[in-house]
């Protein structure tokens, strides 16, 4: 199989995603039943972190171990990357010593340059522009709870950040719709959305974006790297909290998701994230299973 990277959601086809989602279901079932599943024995994952992480590191490191392989954690500050080694050189070296690489960094250009010089698959663990692994887990979580996501409506309330851009790509792949509501000054960057993407609609009022939605989702108002804007963002995002009133505008059985960590009382009310419509803990756990399926696919291809 030719090298396949997962740098943004659109890097895989619908057929590939359907395979990975089915493998996620099987792998999760095996995990719950304590059935050994070790397809990646003697394989090594290198995890490169320029941004801090809890869920990404845990899910990839535990996942690779559960698949029978090994995971190496490498913080850029502890490597030559932190001392100015060119990304291209680091990619050439690392990819000769492992089987797959996951990178969590700032600019998408960094991971694109790395992948262009890598001899093994590269996975985007998060960049400022995209968070495809999280949305893969989110789509699986929706399917797990509600069945097919095709034709459904997802409401995105809050910042036009990496999560939103991955959701918009997912909407094109899986053929669903995204209602987007962001405050003035924090709107979608058109350069990060495909020109032919007709699977979303913009709303000025967040409550209107929630109307009829099958899933309501949000993220923190201040992402990593934008901490100096926090005070201005708190003011600008006033009114964009996902609360019970907004959830009532959605479908009666609508789900709520958040990629975490969450700030109760800011982007989401405690009554929502801790309420019966919230599936955030399943969503977080499914990072583990979805990424195991992704690792398996990118290293081994489709299993017969």
Swiss-Prot record:
Reactions catalysed, semicolon-separated, are: carbamoyl phosphate + L-ornithine = L-citrulline + phosphate + H(+)
SUPFAM superfamilies according to UniProt: Aspartate/ornithine carbamoyltransferase
Looking at the keywords, is Transmembrane helix present? no
| Major localization class | cytoplasm
Identify the GO cellular component terms for this protein.
cytoplasm
What UniProt keywords apply to this chain's record, in alphabetical order? Amino-acid biosynthesis, Arginine biosynthesis, Cytoplasm, Transferase
Which GO molecular function annotations are given, in alphabetical order? amino acid binding; ornithine carbamoyltransferase activity
Q: Name one GO biological process term.
A: citrulline biosynthetic process
Q: Localized where?
A: Cytoplasm
Pathway-wise, it operates in: Amino-acid biosynthesis; L-arginine biosynthesis; L-arginine from L-ornithine and carbamoyl phosphate: step 1/3
Q: Where does L-ornithine bind?
A: 162, 219, 223-224
A Pfam family assignment = OTCace_N
- Write down the EC number: 2.1.3.3
Keyword Amino-acid biosynthesis belongs to the record: yes
Binding positions for carbamoyl phosphate per the UniProt entry = 53-56, 80, 104, 131-134, 259-260, 287
Instruction: Describe the family membership recorded for this protein in Swiss-Prot or TrEMBL.
Output: Belongs to the aspartate/ornithine carbamoyltransferase superfamily. OTCase family.
Q: What does this protein do?
A: Reversibly catalyzes the transfer of the carbamoyl group from carbamoyl phosphate (CP) to the N(epsilon) atom of ornithine (ORN) to produce L-citrulline.
**PANTHER family in the cross-refs:** ORNITHINE CARBAMOYLTRANSFERASE, MITOCHONDRIAL, ORNITHINE TRANSCARBAMYLASE, MITOCHONDRIAL
Stated name of the protein: Ornithine carbamoyltransferase
What taxonomic classification does the UniProt entry list for its organism?
Bacteria, Pseudomonadati, Pseudomonadota, Betaproteobacteria, Burkholderiales
């Amino acid at each position: 199989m030719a090298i396949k990277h997962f740098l943004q959601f659109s890097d895989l086809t619908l057929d590939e995603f359907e395979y990975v989602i089915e493998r996620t279901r099987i792998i999760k079932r095996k995990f719950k039943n304590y059935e050994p599943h070790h397809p990646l024995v003697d394989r090594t994952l290198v995890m490169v972190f320029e941004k801090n992480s809890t869920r990404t590191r845990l899910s990839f490191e535990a996942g690779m171990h559960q698949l029978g392989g090994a995971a190496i954690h490498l913080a850029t500050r502890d490597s030559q990357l932190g001392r100015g080694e060119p990304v291209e050189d680091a990619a050439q070296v690392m990819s000769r010593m492992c089987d797959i690489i996951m990178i969590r960094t700032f600019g998408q250009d960094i991971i694109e340059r790395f992948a262009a010089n890598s001899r093994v698959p590269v996975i985007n663990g998060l960049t400022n522009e995209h968070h495809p692994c999280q949305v893969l887990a989110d789509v699986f979580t929706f399917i797990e709870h509600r069945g097919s996501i095709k034709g459904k409506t997802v409401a995105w309330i809050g910042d036009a950040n990496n999560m939103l851009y991955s959701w918009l790509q997912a909407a094109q792949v899986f053929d669903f719709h995204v209602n987007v509501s962001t405050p003035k000054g924090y709107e979608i960057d058109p350069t990060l959305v495909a020109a032919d993407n007709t699977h979303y609609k913009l709303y000025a009022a967040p409550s209107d974006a929630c109307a009829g939605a099958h899933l309501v989702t949000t993220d923190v108002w201040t992402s990593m790297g934008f901490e100096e804007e926090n005070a201005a963002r708190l003011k600008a995002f006033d009114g964009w909290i996902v609360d019970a009133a907004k959830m009532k505008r959605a479908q009666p059985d609508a789900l709520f998701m958040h990629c975490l960590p969450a700030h109760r009382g800011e982007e989401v009310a405690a009554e929502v994230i801790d309420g019966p419509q919230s599936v955030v803990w399943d969503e977080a756990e499914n990072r583990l299973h979805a990424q195991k399926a992704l690792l398996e696919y990118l290293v081994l291809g489709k299993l017969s």
